[in-house]
Amino acid sequence: MSDSTLTRMDLAEAVFREVGLSRHESAQLVESVLGHISDALVRGEQVKISSFGTFSVRDKNERIGRNPKTGEEVPITPRRVLSFRPSHLMKDRVAAGNRRKG
């Protein structure tokens, strides 16, 4: 497992190298795509990316939790959480450790 992290800048650089847009246009493209994904999730829509996975927002109800140190019961407020469900192809690819060709 790697300690490295893929950043927005890394994505923009990959678009620059692989697509041939300028660095500025590549960065704008990445920001635009991420913005559209974020906006859809804020509206409560699912975002399905073929062969990758599905992002969705789930509403979690209020429930009773427990403080592990004291054992005291505490209410956990209702909230919205972001969920990602990888596609079967992505699961298989990660399990096999296969990198993308190209």
UniProtKB/Swiss-Prot annotation:
UniProt-listed SMART domains: BHL
Bridged cysteine pairs (disulfide): none
Protein name stated in the entry: Integration host factor subunit alpha
Annotated keywords: DNA recombination, DNA-binding, Transcription, Transcription regulation, Translation regulation
Subunit structure: Heterodimer of an alpha and a beta chain.
Biological processes per GO annotation: DNA recombination; positive regulation of metabolic process; regulation of DNA-templated transcription; regulation of translation
One Pfam match: Bac_DNA_binding
Similarity comment: Belongs to the bacterial histone-like protein family.
Stated role: This protein is one of the two subunits of integration host factor, a specific DNA-binding protein that functions in genetic recombination as well as in transcriptional and translational control.
UniProt keyword annotation of ATP-binding present: no
Gene name linked to the record: ihfA
GO cellular component assignments: cytosol
Keyword Plastid part of the UniProt annotation: no
HAMAP family: IHF_alpha
Molecular function terms from GO: DNA binding; structural constituent of chromatin
